[in-house]
Curated annotation (Swiss-Prot):
Keywords: ATP-binding, Cell inner membrane, Cell membrane, Ion transport, Membrane, Nucleotide-binding, Potassium, Potassium transport, Transmembrane, Transmembrane helix, Transport. HAMAP family: KdpC. The chain crosses the membrane at residues 11-31. One of its GO terms (cellular component) is plasma membrane. Belongs to the KdpC family. It is found in: Cell inner membrane. Its main location: membrane. It is a single-pass membrane protein. It comes from Pseudomonas entomophila (strain L48). InterPro entries: KdpC. This is Potassium-transporting ATPase KdpC subunit. It holds the Pfam family KdpC. PANTHER family: POTASSIUM-TRANSPORTING ATPASE C CHAIN, POTASSIUM-TRANSPORTING ATPASE KDPC SUBUNIT.
Amino acid sequence: MTAYVRPALSLILLMTVVTGALYPLAVTGIAQVAFPKQANGSLVRDDRGEVRGSALIAQEFKGDGWFQSRPSAGAYATVASSASNLSPSNPALAERVKTDAAAQYQAQQGPVPQALLTTSGSGLDPHLPPEAIAYQLPRVAAARQVSEERLQVLVNDATLRPLIGPPVVNVLALNQALERLAPLAAR
């Protein structure tokens, strides 16, 4: 029996060291060298170097002077990241969409883009389609006292055009550019 136990325990110890320590350390080291920004969470910093969020996680922006993100089913908390899991035919979803549209977008003209009223699959998608940003442009321009044309330049610069899929705008990056152009604190 010792002939079987000793090699088995040796293998367990060896694999524990390799897969529990050496492999994770090697992957972390390679990631830090090859992709330091992504390995550390794609953190977004302001002009003072302070972390303002991650380029991969949506944030809530309140007030007319900011472009709004998609709604979040988990209150923008990464721990509670999830979709609402409500089907399009669910009356609770219809009521929430109706309430959100009335509360946030009642003063604006035309139908509210779907992306501004529905949560994403993760509940934390940081991107919006350019149409959803364009819908918010008049409100933000009025609040910041900046022309819509100047804001449209910011939107065009912030629009990502992936190889596959439609163009999207990272709301955090756009709001940071907006703050550099026309700081809200100065108003």
